[in-house]
Structure formats: structure tokens, C-alpha cells
């Protein structure tokens, strides 16, 4: 047994033996822990006393032995260690005692009078802030509330930094739960309402913490305080205004927007609210685009200006800020971070709800520039000219990223419904692969695949452009072409080139696109038994990818033919057997329309094929029965 294990178990005889064998009574192990630390951590007061009598614990300890003892609730060990502690370095221990509910230990520490820091120099109290405070669960404020309310009316000999910490914990509690403690602390003038506390290497303040949590009631109380500084910055060096905007649903209500407007202010020029490692403004900008009104959008622009780089482009467009937009696009030093697709989707949803011709004209100007520079897909401009804000949303997502369900659902209606019941041929591949108006699928990029700030892409934006152009001469053909692009964009594959010979139904079946299969089967123009040059039908494609729901949907079609053969002579039952999905085999057999006499090009029927190929026994048995 080594000295560390002996200390942990409180074995004084073993500790003595280890020391006699030459062990260092204060020597750390490979993790930097001393024998005294193990005795404290395990709650062994006699072992602690014996080790200290041998000189242990004289040097600095990391972590603090007192904080370890407090964290375990060992009051007797706290009393033993206290005479050897430096109070200015033990403020975390007192915070821990109150936070964990060990209030008797907290009373013992406070009664020493050492935590009032009356004799401290200014630099000493600053060290309390720089040392930082422990991060705690959001419910810890309740322990501080109980501790302070029970001692209400007493003059606690504590330095202000402890009340500052209590105020911060109260503002960080979820759903305004800490409001009563906030009002009590401010009413008693205990804390500094503008205090800064280091948590996990980041400065936090009560105002910014409440904003980050979206605690509107607490925010209103803090804003009304006569000494509040609305420009003070906390985590990420952000003011409360940005933290509130980034909080989910914080500005979804009018009250939230009112408080956001009260928090807003104009920053000094060149003030950066982001660092070089990570753009943190996406959540704030997304909420503003979704819930903010024009005034709030402009307040964000006034605060952030060019510090967000291209990330702010959708906000500038919506606010019709021509000068700011021109500066961002022309600035060589602008951040190359691209706005996420959701920003552009929210901007399109804004145009769908409101007839903002000025902002739409500016959007068109920007789109023309980006299309001309081959930064954006030409389909975006076509959709803008047609004011088709539902259809346009898909094109802002890269091919490697499937658009959200709400985006793809909108593109199916109403244009696609019209297409289904038109006279267009929906069974062949693209009927006009090289015709006029055909978009070149080979060069469809992500909306921002390149940085528009290079010198070769300087622009001068007009304040407004006409937002509409003549409709396509053949709307059905135009819709069909656009839908083909939507399909390849949504499913991240470019299958509708001129050389692609699959019909849309086969493609949808193979791509597991059940909504599109259902939509196509509603059209009288769709041939459910269409065979491509390899004689494969949509049913064969669905079975090949083991998509049982789509197979079942196709089998329910009144015109389905289960016994069509591909170029190798294989029917649907061959595909199902080879695919190894017993449920699909049983589904086909259950129709009672399977022709088991059909032979493939090798002269084998499906039962003979299954035995020769040594397929699963359950498959062979199902076919034999």
C-alpha cells in the first residue's frame, strides 16, 4: 500500500511506515495530488491532522485543499485547514459552501471575518475577479437565496464580490426563476449591477447573462436600474443586445422586441463583436430575420456594421442599406465566412409575406451581380423575376446538404401540382436537355462558393431595380425544368443530365423519395410500368434498394405489372429474392399475381435461381411454398 492509498483510507500506521521508507510526506503523485489531498478528499480528519503534523500542506495546493474539504461537506477538516489558508485565495471555497448548501461551513468561514477583505489592497480584490468563479448548475441560485433570506437583517461581513456572484447566478437561472433574488440584492444595494465575473475563462455580467438566457423579466429590472451600463460586454465580448437576439425565441414576442430595442445602442466604429476563430452571430442574425421588424434589423446593423463580414448581407438587403451592402461586397478585407442557407430562406420568407419592393429591388441587384460572377445559380434570378419565393429557397443549400423538410415541401406546391396534370411527358428523361432556357446543371454551385470581396468583383449597386420580368412563354415546360433542378438539388445527385435515361418515377423510387412517388402516381401522365433502356421499371428500382413502403405504394397502383422482365430476364420476384428482404418477397407473393414460371436469361426460374445462388433459407422457403 503506497502513501496515497494509506492517506485515502485513513491508515495512519501505513502512512508512518511509508514515511519511514523514505516517502515524501508532501510529494505529489503523477496527477499532482499529495497524500494530504487524498486524506481531505476522502474525509479522513485524523490522517489530515497526522500528515500536517509532519509538515504536509505547507506549500501551495492546486486545487485548494480547503475547497476540496468544503466540496465534501467535511466541516471538521475545514476547521483544521483554515488556520493555514490565505483568505484572499479561498473565495471560491466560500462560494462553493453556499452553492452546495453547506451553510454551516459557510457561517464558520464568514465568522472568521476574513472574507470582508477590509485590509486588502485594490490589486488584491482584482485578483478575486481574475481568479474566476466556479460554473454552477442553473438551480444553485436557490441555495444563495435561502442563505441570504434566512440571514436577512444581519450585516454579513462579506466583500461585494460575493453578492456580485449571487446576482450573476440569479440572472442565469432559467425562466426568470431568479427574479426574487435579483430584486432583493439590488434593493439592498449589495452587489455592483455592472460587475464582471470570470467563468470558464470568459467574463460574464448580470445583464449579458440574463440576455443570454432570454430572461425578459430580469432584463427589465436590470435595465430600469439607475446605474446600469447597457454597453457593457460579457461573454464573447458581446453586449446584452446581441446575447438577447441570439437567445432562442427571445424576440418572438412583442415584449422581447421592446426590450431588445431598449438594449440597442450604436457602437463605436471598428468595434468587433466576433473573433477570428468562430462566427458567433448566426443565431442572433437568424432570429432577427425571423422575428425582427425593420427597426430592429437596422439597430443590429448600426451595432455590428462590417464586423460580421458577409454574414450581414441578408440584413443589409432587407433594410435596403445600399451603401453598407456595397462596402461589404467590395471590401478586400471582409470575412470570407458565408451566410448559412437559412439566412437566405428567411429573407425569401420575408419577401413572401411583405411587398417590400425597395428591398426586393436591392436583392435582385445583388443576385444579378452574383449570378454574373458565377457565384450564384442562375435559377435564383429566374425565381426572383417570377417572384417565386417558395421555389427559390432550395437553391441556397449546397449539394452536400439536404434542405429542411419545410423547404422541400413548399417546392411541391402549387407549381409541381400544375405540372403533374399538364400535357408534359413525365415518363422520359429531360425532353429539352439542350434547349433554350435550359439551366446548365453542370455549373450549379452553392450560393456562396466563393468570396465576393475580391478585386475582380467590385460592384456599384443601384438602390432599386424592377422586381419582375415577363413570364416564361411556356410555363409548364419552365416549371418542369425547374422541378428537375429541384430534384437533383434536394437529393444531392445530378441525375437529369442529357444522358440520364431514367424517368422521374424510377429516379424517385431509387432515391427513397416517397413524397415524390406519391405525387407522381397521382398524375394520369405517369406510366407506372415505364421501362428504361435496361428494361428496368420503377418497381424494380424500389425493390433493388429494399424500400418496402415505396414497393407497397407501387403495388397498390391498379396498372402495376409485376412480371415485366429487365434486359437480363429478371422480374420483380427475382429482384426481391436477391435483395434478401423477406418482407418484400412476401409482399409480392401476397398479391397472387407473381408468375413463377418466368425464366431469366440463364434459363432459371426464381425458385431454381434462389437455390443455385444459395440465398437465405427463409427466402428459399417462402418461394417454395
Swiss-Prot record:
Repeat positions for ANK: 1-27, 31-60, 62-89, 90-119, 162-195, 202-232, 500-530, 534-562, 568-598
Species this chain originates from: Aspergillus oryzae (strain ATCC 42149 / RIB 40)
Top-rank taxon, per record: Eukaryota
Entry keywords, A to Z: ANK repeat, Repeat
Described purpose of this protein according to its UniProt entry: Ankyrin repeat domain-containing protein; part of the gene cluster that mediates the biosynthesis of oryzines, natural products with an unusual maleidride backbone. The two subunits of the fungal fatty acid synthase oryfasA and oryfasB probably form octenoic acid. This fatty acid is most likely activated by the acyl-CoA ligase oryP to give octenyl-CoA before the citrate synthase-like protein oryE catalyzes condensation with oxaloacetate to form tricarboxylic acid.
Pathway annotation from the record: Secondary metabolite biosynthesis
Protein name from the UniProt record: Ankyrin repeat domain-containing protein oryK
Amino acid at each position: 500500500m503506497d502513501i496515497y492509498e494509506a492517506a485515502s483510507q485513513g491508515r495512519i500506521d501505513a502512512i508512518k511506515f511509508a514515511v519511514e521508507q523514505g516517502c515524501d510526506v508532501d510529494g505529489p503523485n503523477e496527477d499532482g495530488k499529495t497524500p494530504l489531498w487524498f486524506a481531505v478528499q476522502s474525509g479522513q480528519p485524523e490522517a489530515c491532522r497526522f500528515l500536517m503534523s509532519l509538515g504536509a500542506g505547507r506549500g501551495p495546493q492546486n486545487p485548494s485543499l480547503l475547497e476540496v474539504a468544503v466540496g465534501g461537506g467535511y466541516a471538521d477538516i475545514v476547521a483544521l485547514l483554515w488556520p493555514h489558508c490565505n483568505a484572499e485565495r479561498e473565495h471560491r471555497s466560500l462560494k462553493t459552501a453556499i452553492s452546495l448548501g453547506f451553510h454551516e461551513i459557510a457561517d464558520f468561514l464568514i465568522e472568521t471575518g476574513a472574507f470582508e477583505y477590509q485590509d486588502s489592497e485594490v490589486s488584491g480584490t482584482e485578483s478575486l475577479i481574475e481568479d474566476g468563479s466556479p460554473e454552477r448548475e442553473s438551480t444553485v441560485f436557490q441555495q444563495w437565496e435561502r442563505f441570504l433570506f434566512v440571514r436577512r437583517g444581519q450585516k454579513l461581513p462579506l466583500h461585494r464580490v460575493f453578492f456580485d456572484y449571487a446576482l450573476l447566478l440569479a440572472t442565469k437561472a432559467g425562466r426568470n426563476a431568479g427574479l426574487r433574488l435579483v430584486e432583493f440584492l439590488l434593493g439592498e444595494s449589495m452587489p455592483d449591477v455592472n460587475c464582471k465575473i470570470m467563468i470558464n475563462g470568459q467574463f460574464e455580467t448580470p445583464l449579458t447573462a440574463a440576455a443570454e438566457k432570454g430572461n425578459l423579466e430580469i432584463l427589465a429590472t436590470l435595465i430600469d436600474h439607475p446605474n446600469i451600463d447597457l454597453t457593457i460586454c460579457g461573454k464573447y465580448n458581446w453586449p446584452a443586445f446581441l446575447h438577447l437576439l441570439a437567445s432562442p425565441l427571445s424576440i418572438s414576442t412583442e415584449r422581447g422586441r421592446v426590450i431588445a430595442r431598449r438594449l440597442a445602442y450604436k457602437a463605436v466604429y471598428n468595434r468587433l463583436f466576433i473573433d477570428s476563430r468562430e462566427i458567433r452571430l448566426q443565431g442572433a442574425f437568424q432570429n432577427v430575420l425571423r422575428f425582427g421588424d425593420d427597426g430592429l434589423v437596422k439597430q443590429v446593423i448600426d451595432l455590428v456594421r462590417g464586423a460580421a463580414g458577409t454574414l450581414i448581407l441578408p440584413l443589409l438587403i432587407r433594410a435596403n442599406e445600399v451603401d453598407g451592402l456595397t462596402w461589404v461586397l467590395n471590401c478586400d478585407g471582409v470575412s470570407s465566412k458565408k451566410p448559412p442557407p437559412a439566412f437566405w430562406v428567411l429573407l425569401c420568407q420575408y419577401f413572401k409575406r411583405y411587398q417590400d419592393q425597395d428591398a426586393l429591388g436591392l436583392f435582385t441587384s445583388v443576385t444579378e451581380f452574383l449570378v454574373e460572377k458565377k457565384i450564384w445559380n442562375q435559377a435564383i434570378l429566374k425565381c426572383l423575376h417570377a417572384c417565386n419565393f417558395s421555389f427559390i429557397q432550395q437553391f441556397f443549400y449546397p449539394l452536400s446538404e439536404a434542405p429542411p423538410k419545410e423547404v422541400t415541401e413548399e417546392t411541391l406546391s402549387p407549381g409541381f401540382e400544375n405540372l403533374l396534370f399538364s400535357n408534359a411527358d413525365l415518363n422520359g428523361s429531360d425532353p429539352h436537355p439542350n434547349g433554350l432556357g435550359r439551366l446548365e446543371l453542370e455549373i450549379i454551385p452553392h450560393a456562396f462558393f466563393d468570396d465576393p470581396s475580391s478585386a475582380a468583383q467590385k460592384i456599384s449597386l443601384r438602390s432599386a431595380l424592377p422586381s419582375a420580368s415577363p413570364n416564361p412563354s411556356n410555363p409548364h415546360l419552365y416549371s418542369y425544368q425547374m422541378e428537375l433542378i429541384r430534384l437533383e438539388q434536394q437529393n444531392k445527385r445530378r441525375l437529369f443530365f442529357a444522358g440520364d435515361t431514367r424517368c422521374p418515377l424510377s429516379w424517385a423510387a431509387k432515391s427513397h423519395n416517397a413524397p415524390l412517388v406519391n405525387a407522381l402516381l397521382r398524375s394520369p401522365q405517369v406510366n407506372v410500368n415505364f421501362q428504361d433502356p435496361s428494361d428496368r421499371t420503377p418497381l424494380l428500382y424500389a425493390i433493388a434498394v429494399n424500400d418496402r413502403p415505396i414497393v407497397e405504394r407501387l403495388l397498390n397502383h391498379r396498372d402495376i405489372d409485376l412480371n415485366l422482365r429487365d434486359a437480363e430476364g429478371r422480374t420483380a420476384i427475382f429482384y426481391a429474392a436477391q435483395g434478401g428482404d423477406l418482407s418484400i418477397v412476401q409482399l409480392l407473393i401476397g398479391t397472387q399475381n407473381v408468375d413463377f414460371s418466368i425464366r431469366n436469361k440463364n434459363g432459371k426460374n426464381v425458385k431454381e435461381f434462389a437455390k443455385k445462388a444459395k440465398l437465405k433459407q427463409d427466402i428459399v422457403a417462402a418461394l417454395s411454398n
